[in-house]
Amino acid sequence: MKRRDIEDIRRGIRDRDRRLVRLLNDRARLSVEMGRIKADAGLGVFDPVQERRVLDGIASLGEGPLSAEALRNIWREILSASRALQAPLAVACLGPEGSFAHLAALERFGRSTRLAPQVTIGAVFDAVEKRRSDLGVVPLENSVEGPVRTTLERLISTPLAIRGEICLRVSHCLLAKGAGRRIRRVYSHPQALAQCRQWLARHLPEAAPVETESTSAAVLQALGDRQGAAIASRLASEIYGLPAVETGIEDHPANTTRFIVIGTGTNIPTGRDKTSVLFSTQHRPGALHAALAPFASAGINLLRIESHPVRDRMWQYLFFVDLEGHAEDRAVKDSLRSLRRKTAFLKVLGSYPREVEPS
């Protein structure tokens, strides 16, 4: 390619960049105007239903060479910047920076959102309940290790609702200063340690696992331990300067963690929703079958059901159920009404747009 051809292409790119900036600023001005209207109406800037529509619409417009996923990533940052212009949005997440909850929050809200990392899952709930943050991001379940008990326990008592979900493919790295033969302790969150159990047994059989509040907290511990290592994300390695000596050490390559967005308010139906409920039944034979029968009769698909022991009540359980549909859908509303009559306790945790899990 001739030098002149390169310069012609660069001029073409600069011209399109200028036009893009003008259009983005035009869009931003409209977004600011929308923010004023929302504020006058008492509406929040976070609208997961509308954002889903925008991202789906943009992805459908793609004709290449940019993929639908690339377009979603670009517009996610545009939406993040637009929200920041309307009103600052504070999102609490399990931290410190570089944790998988921090990654999930970035994935959902973009880099223009003010993220507020917290030390524990409970602290995330507290930050939103006490209105120090507008929303929170906490892990709910992992495809390999199952539910996160701390999150389930807080959902029982919190006045907050589930406003959205984020499904994040989890890839673990071993971060350390020294060679593997010198590692005597491996720090990480209990779920991360469990997800890498087989790899650790094969490669670091002498190393003792040490539990921490988060994967990023594990990196901070390992930084001060010459014979220590941490299981964390590649982003955590970049943020804290601890080299990733091994990558992809999770036992199951399809390892996915589901996070939920917690906050006040409710979402309107989208036609592709999920509703989460928590309930307990009377302690008698057939009680669970009778409680779930209305959903089968209405043709409502149950996506997930987990039993959760009730503290201080031996052999009594709470059931966490995800079902297809929105709590305002007629069939779901009628089924929930029937469920309430057949249970000792029922709490609708929220209805929200259903995410597609990473393939």
Set out the residue ranges of the language-model regions.
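Domain-level signature for soluble enzymes in the chorismate/prephenate branch of the shikimate pathway
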Residues: 1-359
